[in-house]
Amino acid sequence: TSDLNYLLSRRLEVEGRLRKGIENEEFFLRYQPQVDVATGRIVGMEALMRWNDPVKGEIFPKDFISVAEELGLIVQLGEWAFRTACRQLKGWEDEGVRDVSVAVNISPRQFMSRRLVASLLAIVREAGADPHRVEVEITDAGPNSLLGQPKTAALTANWPVPTF
């Protein structure tokens, strides 16, 4: 029971810090280059969410995404990440970088949303980014996800955001 108490207190701590982190805008994106192995040229960037917790420092998604999913905060975080990545893409476009795409991970819960396409299109338009250079990757993050696979499994489905 002491192990269970420890896990429960740790979980409650993460939940509280996660809510506060969203409120205090402690999340940020890192961009990992996607390289064409034939040419060595950077062809895209993958947006990777991180949490800059004031107590724990940089926290990786494996330590907070499942909690965000269970709390129903994942859609909010996913939309924030998509918006931030689209704004960054527009910034790169404004600087003359026009041949690079950006890929953003969304959760199965966000993918199942009825308003997903409308939401993503609105974000792309709001940012003024080229929708043909935005990719969405659907990640399988936990036991209640789209595929019902273990936490280590991942599904990536890339599709350019439509422009209709």
Name these PLM-found stretches.
Residues 101, 118-164:
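The catalytic core of metal-dependent phosphodiesterases that act on cyclic dinucleotides
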Residues 2-129, 141:
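Bacterial c-di-GMP phosphodiesterase EAL domain
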